[in-house]
Amino acid sequence: MSRLSRLQRQVLSLYRELLRAGRGKPGAEARVRAEFRQHASLPRSDVLRIEYLYRRGRRQLQLLRSGHATAMGTFVRPRGPTEEPVDATAPGNRLDDSDALKNPCEGTGARETRSDGR
């Protein structure tokens, strides 16, 4: 087996720390395992994404270690037995130009900034 890189060692260390911090908190260990398993297939060359996920994991670890976290879970909308996944590109699901906002600030109450900064 080849020697692990520094980033790989950090990720494995984070995994162990998250599992330890999640002991005794309902759903935490399963959530940690599922999250790491989901991203295990990331290519080693995708360093930016790996570093982003590492930083996100560090923040979650801090939350777990703080006394405020009592459990860990996810927000998942279960699909019904006959419900199909929605395909945004299907002809019946396409937004026409009249439905789309013309300006990203439209509808937010934010003022539009002119290109000269005023």
UniProtKB/Swiss-Prot annotation:
Keywords: Chaperone, Mitochondrion, Repeat. CDD domains: Complex1_LYR_SDHAF1_LYRM8. InterPro entries: Complex1_LYR_dom, Complex1_LYR_SDHAF1_LYRM8, SDHAF1. It comes from the Eukaryota. GO terms for biological process: mitochondrial respiratory chain complex II assembly. A motif (LYR motif 2) lies at residues 53-55. A motif (LYR motif 1) lies at residues 14-16. Signal peptide: none annotated. This is Succinate dehydrogenase assembly factor 1, mitochondrial. It comes from Rattus norvegicus (Rat).
